[in-house]
Amino acid sequence: VGFAMNGFGFIGLGFDQFEYKRSLYLYNSNFDDWEKMNSMGSTTGQGLERSSAVAFVANYKAYIGTGQGGNPYLRDFWEYNSTSNTWTQVADFAGSSRREAAAFGILDFGYVGTGIDSTGTLKKDFWKYDPILNTWTSISDFGGTARKQAVSFTMGGQGYVGTGDDGSFTNDFWQYEPLTDSWEQKADFAGTARYGATGFGIFPNAYLGTGYDNTLSYTNDFWEYNYFNDTWVQVADFIGTPRANATSFAVGDRGFLGTGYDGQTLDDFYEYTPILSVESQFQIKSKVYPNPVKNELNIYLNNSIEVDELMLYSLSGKIIFQETKIVTNNRISTNVTKLASGMYLYSAKENGRVVAHGKFMVAK
């Protein structure tokens, strides 16, 4: 499993071609350095070794569970506190024991679903974990077919699940909205259908690649998904060997990917820096002037359109402002006096479709 928390990346558990593991390592991207942390369950965790588990971050802690080890189908869950480097067992996953499931964390909650259970049944149920109450609650089933080995990650305030093995290779891609407990199908992944891929979100883009595809080949292609446009474009190939079951995470505006299997288990690791050019993907070019902004945000459009909604976001994708607006002389204006200094994103919609988006800075 892999996850990012408190500015660091973490990789743990797995199978090294000889045995199941429960070890955990912290990656410091500032120094390109790995540090061994306490293994899952700490000194009393013997027997917790596993692979095909899931992990999510919620309420500033990581949660790891399910998978296969001495028992091929597990449902126990463990909380990892990176500040104290300690493990605490929490409530078992409320669904059936399983492996190769999907998971993501959104703010204070974790979400786990899909996978394959001990009867060989592919699953599409999904469950929400509340760390404060230490309880699991059934939520809406995954919107696609039951499957295992799907990609899952968080971007902004939503969760994403896609690709995977439902008895065949898949390329569908779904967004989970926690506010309405609903799944919405997004544009299909533009690469070949596959399972065992990996992905991470750096709002407003997500990145998905590698895996084992419908040509019966390990892959190293990578693709960028844009939140605003619901579109995929191919980006630079992963520079390691083609592989499946790799692990990845994002720290800040950089992605990190490694390990996996290409006929043998791997331990190499790579950094990916996206070209963060929001303007290159505009349907309609727009410009903020002046930028930085102090009290009033002015967005200038190069085409005459009837914008009916303006939304402002934090860099993590959280919606912080939403307002009906009217375009005057190709300009949208709004008061941002209440915004703290920092970088923000905006999107403008016409008839429900995003027609322009970009970044701006507030400087008080």
Task: Report the location of each language-model feature.
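Sequence/structural signature of beta-propeller modules
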Residues: P274-I275, S280-F282
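Kelch-like beta-propeller repeat domains
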Residues: V1-I275
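C-terminal outer-membrane/trafficking sorting elements
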Residues: Q281-Y289, V293-K364
